[in-house]
């Protein structure tokens, strides 16, 4: 069973709202960089970057972050053909003394964000990391909290939340898949 909880128009309105929140929170955008966690987080980061530029005239430096080697669940993969493939980060971005806007699609246990923060240290010591999450579904295992949330969606552990993006899925929407 599938239920669409955010359609295309609401998806883009959510991008716009989060972009406004980022601009409003910071007196200046000069020391901000935006980093999207591959794959869907990176596409959401790209949408945010474009919208912030439309609203402020400032093009934030950005990067796609691959966290493959920083994950703590690789030992749980029992088949070699199921192992994730490292595709690298899109470019090197010096985050030293910058405020990093870290972007991902779904916040669940918090483990992906922990891995992303570990990966970010390879690019310098950020002054601050702020977290943008498109959908927060709860069920945290680590003390991770988002600074900007598109939508809070209470779920059961059996449900799956899918954030769908144009490049990955051919559309912008969010669905809950249940049993």
UniProtKB/Swiss-Prot annotation:
Listed InterPro entries: PRibTrfase_dom, PRTase-like, PyrR, PyrR_bifunctional
Enzyme nomenclature, EC number: 2.4.2.9
GO biological processes: regulation of DNA-templated transcription
Motif position, PRPP-binding: 100-112
Gene Ontology terms, MF aspect: uracil phosphoribosyltransferase activity
Keyword terms: Glycosyltransferase, Transcription, Transcription regulation, Transferase
Keyword RNA-binding: no
Any one Pfam family match given in the protein's UniProt record, by short name: Pribosyltran
Record's catalysed reaction(s): UMP + diphosphate = 5-phospho-alpha-D-ribose 1-diphosphate + uracil
Family, as annotated: Belongs to the purine/pyrimidine phosphoribosyltransferase family. PyrR subfamily.
Its job: Regulates the transcription of the pyrimidine nucleotide (pyr) operon in response to exogenous pyrimidines. Also displays a weak uracil phosphoribosyltransferase activity which is not physiologically significant.
Protein name: Bifunctional protein PyrR
Organism: Haemophilus influenzae (strain PittEE)
